[in-house]
Curated annotation (Swiss-Prot):
UniProt xrefs under InterPro entries: Homeodomain-like_sf, HTH_AraC, HTH_AraC-typ_CS, Tscrpt_reg_AraC-type_HTH
Boundaries of every HTH araC/xylS-type domain copy: 195-292
Role played: Positive regulator of the expression of the invasion-associated type III secretion system encoded within SPI-1 (pathogenicity island 1).
Keywords on record: Activator, DNA-binding, Transcription, Transcription regulation
One GO MF term attached to the UniProt entry: transcription cis-regulatory region binding
Entry protein name: Transcriptional regulator SirC
Residue range(s) of DNA binding per entry: 212-233, 259-282
PANTHER family, A to Z: HTH-TYPE TRANSCRIPTIONAL REGULATOR GADX
SMART domains per UniProt: HTH_ARAC
A GO cellular component entry from the record: cytosol
Amino acid sequence: MVLPSMNKSVEAISNNHLQQPNKFPLINGLADVRDYYVANCLLFKLNKGSLRIENEFGEFIEQSALCLFLLEKDQTITLSMSEIEGHIDFSSLEVSYDLMQKFYKVFYSTRNYNDRELSLKTKPKYFFHADLLPGMSDTFDSILHGVACPRVCSNVSIDDHDYSYFSLMYLISAFVRKPGGFDFLERAIKITTKEKVYNIIISDLTRKWSQAEVAGKLFMSVSSLKRKLAAEEVSFSKIYLDARMNQAIKLLRMGAGNISQVATMCGYDTPSYFIAIFKRHFKITPLSFMRTMNH
C-alpha cells in the first residue's frame, strides 16, 4: 500500500495492500472469501450491501452498510458478503504493525483508567464495527484516493506528521474506547514468531525459502524455530502457504497480471499447480475470483 510520505523510516500501511473499492456480481446474492489470513490490522469500510465476518475462534459479526470494521491481525477469517438492492461495495486499508505501535503510544498516553480496566476485563474481541459518524467516510476515502498505486507497488512509508497518519488515527479512535478496545491495541503491538516468519517469507515470495534460511534471519537455530512454532500451534509450511495465498489474492484483485504471472510472483513454478492450491485453499478458482473481483 502506498501512502504519500517523505520519511522512509516508518513502515506505512504495509506492502501495497490497499484494496480499491469493488462491486460484486453475486450468485444468490452472496459472495464468500474463505480462509483468509489477516496478516495486519485491517480497516474495512462497507459502502453498500451487508457483511458477515467469522473467525476460527467462532466469533462473528454481521452488519449492513454504511459502517466501518476493524479486524485484528493474526487470525483466519471467512467473509460472507450479501447484496442489498443489487449492490455490494467495500474498501479496505491494511495498517502495519509499526504504525499500530505508534497509535498505541498515543492512545495509551491519553487513556482513561476506568475505560482501560473495563476493556481488559472484557472477553477478547477480534473485530469491531462502528457506525460512520460525520466525516469518517470522507476521511477514509481521502486516504484511499490519496494513494498513487502502480500495478505492483513497493514498500513506502508514512510520516508521523503526514495527513494520512492523523486521518488513520482518527478512524481507529472510533474503536479504542469500545469494550475490549484497549485489549485489542495491546495485542496489536505484540508480534509472534509466526508473524515474524510470515513477514520474512512475504518480503520475497519468488525466493524458495527454507526453514534454515528463515531461522538464520531470526538469529535462531532451526530446532528453536520449530519449537517456537510448535508452541504457537502452527507449522512452517502453513505460514508459507498463507503468505503465498494472501499475495495471490491481492495480486489477482489488483489485476497485477494474468494467472501465470501471478503464479510466478507467488513463487510457483507451474500455473496448474498454483491453480490447484488456490482452489483447495479458497474453494474458488483464480479465474472465477478474478472475474468476481474485477467485474
